[in-house]
């Protein structure tokens, strides 16, 4: 499968997920706190290269792939490279946003509004401490609704769907900045000996 077909397949998967999440939010009234990027500041977020392939392809088309790869190669922080604090003083307090929100990965989309099954087979919402504490009533109501059959995106289901697009790239779970690097490298290597996409002569 070509890179562009993989990108379109991932985009299509995300489009369906975004609709599911919007429906879940509407039914539960759960939402991220405005201006909060606390979950993005965790240093132990893992992801697959495939979920960031649309982001890497976007960089490539805009001539930013090689530069971003260089930046990632010298980056010492484990915090996601795409995360952008609102200001210098907000660097460590969780106030920030994704600088490429449209192209955020699967883990970024699922966390907060996706669920996993516990050892008893029960659905447990995977969300942050802030939502659990500041939206406690809605969170408890949502958790109860899950037990009663409310539809919610499931992490394992979506990662299985992702791996069906590319088994290797979809199952390679690594630290998030490594995933970003591998996604860019995949695009650059693909076009190293192939013509650039039509209409894009100065990519990379």
Residue ranges and their predicted role:
Residues 1-34, 38, 42, 46-204:
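Short loop/turn segments that flank or connect secondary-structure elements
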């Amino acid at each position: 499968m070509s890179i562009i077909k993989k990108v379109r397949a991932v985009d299509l998967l995300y489009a369906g997920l975004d609709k599911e999440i919007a429906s879940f939010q509407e039914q539960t009234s759960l939402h991220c706190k405005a201006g909060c990027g606390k979950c993005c500041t965790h240093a132990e977020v893992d992801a697959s290269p495939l979920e960031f392939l649309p982001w890497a392809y976007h960089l490539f088309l805009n001539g930013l792939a090689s530069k971003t790869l260089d930046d990632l190669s010298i980056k010492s922080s484990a915090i996601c490279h795409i995360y952008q604090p609102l200001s210098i003083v907000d660097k460590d307090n969780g106030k920030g946003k994704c600088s490429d929100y449209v192209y955020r990965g699967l883990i970024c989309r699922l966390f907060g509004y996706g669920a996993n099954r516990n050892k008893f087979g029960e659905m447990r919402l995977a969300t942050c401490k802030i939502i659990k504490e500041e939206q406690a009533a809605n969170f408890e109501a949502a958790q109860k609704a899950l037990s009663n059959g409310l539809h919610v995106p499931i992490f394992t289901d979506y990662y299985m769907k992702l791996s069906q697009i590319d088994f290797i790239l979809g199952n390679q779970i690594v630290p998030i900045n490594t995933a970003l690097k591998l996604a860019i490298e995949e695009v650059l290597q693909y076009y190293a000996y192939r013509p650039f996409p039509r209409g894009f002569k100065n990519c990379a």
